[in-house]
C-alpha cells in the first residue's frame, strides 16, 4: 500500500494511493497534526530541536484549529506547518515501497494555433488544435478534421474546439492519472490547457480535471 498524492483540504487530508490489493483509491480523512513546544518536564519523551532544546508534542485539534493556536501561542512552536508532510510521516514511516506498474502515468502534448504569434499562457488566446495523451498502452489524439492515425493510436475526431476540450475532459475524468508529464508540460501545456478550458468552457469544466473537483493556481519557475 502506498500514497501517490497527499494534499490539505480544509480540515481534511485529501489522500490518493494504491491499496494492498493494487486498487487505486482516494478519500478525505480528518487529521489532527502534532507540533512541538519547549518543555522542562523530565518525564517527557527525549525530543530535542537541532539546537538542543527539549520539546514535547502537543495536539491542538483540527488543522485549522492548530494554525490558529500557533498564531496565539506565546512561545516558539516547532514542527511542520505544511501538514500533508506530517500526515505522510505519521502514516507512511520509513521507505515507501512503490510499485511503478500500479502508478498511472499520463504523457500529454497539445498543439495550438499561432495566428497571433506564440500563445500567451495567461490569456490562453489561441485555439487548441489537438491534444495527445498516452497512459499505459492507451494512446489517444483529439483533434478536428480528417486524420489517419497509426494502428496504436485512437483518434477522436471532433467538430470544433469546444467538443475537443469536452471529450478530453470527460475521458480524463473517467480515469485520473497519478502523474502527468510531457515535454515542457509544466511550463506550457498544462497551464495553457487549464486557462484555455476556463476561457472556453468555464471554471466548472476545468474543475473536472481534478479528482477532487477543484484546483488552485501556483506560480512556477
Where do the model's predicted regions map?
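The two-metal-ion catalytic cores of nucleic-acid processing enzymes
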Residues: 1-221
Amino acid at each position: 500500500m502506498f500514497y501517490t498524492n497527499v494534499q490539505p483540504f480544509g480540515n481534511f487530508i485529501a489522500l490518493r494511493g494504491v491499496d494492498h490489493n493494487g486498487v487505486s483509491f482516494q478519500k478525505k480523512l480528518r487529521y489532527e497534526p502534532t507540533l512541538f513546544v519547549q518543555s522542562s518536564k523530565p518525564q517527557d519523551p527525549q525530543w530535542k530541536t537541532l539546537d538542543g532544546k527539549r520539546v514535547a508534542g502537543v495536539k491542538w485539534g483540527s488543522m485549522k484549529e492548530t494554525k490558529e493556536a500557533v498564531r496565539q501561542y506565546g512561545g516558539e512552536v516547532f514542527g511542520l506547518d505544511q501538514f500533508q508532510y506530517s500526515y505522510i510521516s505519521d502514516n507512511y514511516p520509513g521507505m515507501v515501497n512503490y510499485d511503478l506498474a500500479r502508478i498511472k502515468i499520463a504523457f500529454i502534448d497539445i498543439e495550438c494555433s499561432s495566428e497571433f504569434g506564440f500563445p500567451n499562457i495567461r490569456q490562453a488566446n489561441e485555439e487548441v488544435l489537438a491534444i495527445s495523451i498516452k497512459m499505459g498502452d492507451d494512446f489517444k489524439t483529439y483533434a478536428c478534421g480528417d486524420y489517419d492515425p497509426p494502428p496504436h493510436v485512437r483518434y477522436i475526431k471532433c467538430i470544433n474546439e469546444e467538443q475537443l476540450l469536452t471529450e478530453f475532459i470527460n475521458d480524463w475524468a473517467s480515469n485520473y492519472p497519478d502523474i502527468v508529464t510531457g515535454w515542457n508540460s509544466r511550463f506550457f501545456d498544462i497551464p495553457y490547457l487549464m486557462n484555455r478550458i476556463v476561457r472556453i468552457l468555464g471554471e466548472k469544466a476545468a474543475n473536472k480535471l481534478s479528482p477532487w473537483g477543484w484546483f488552485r493556481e501556483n506560480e512556477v519557475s
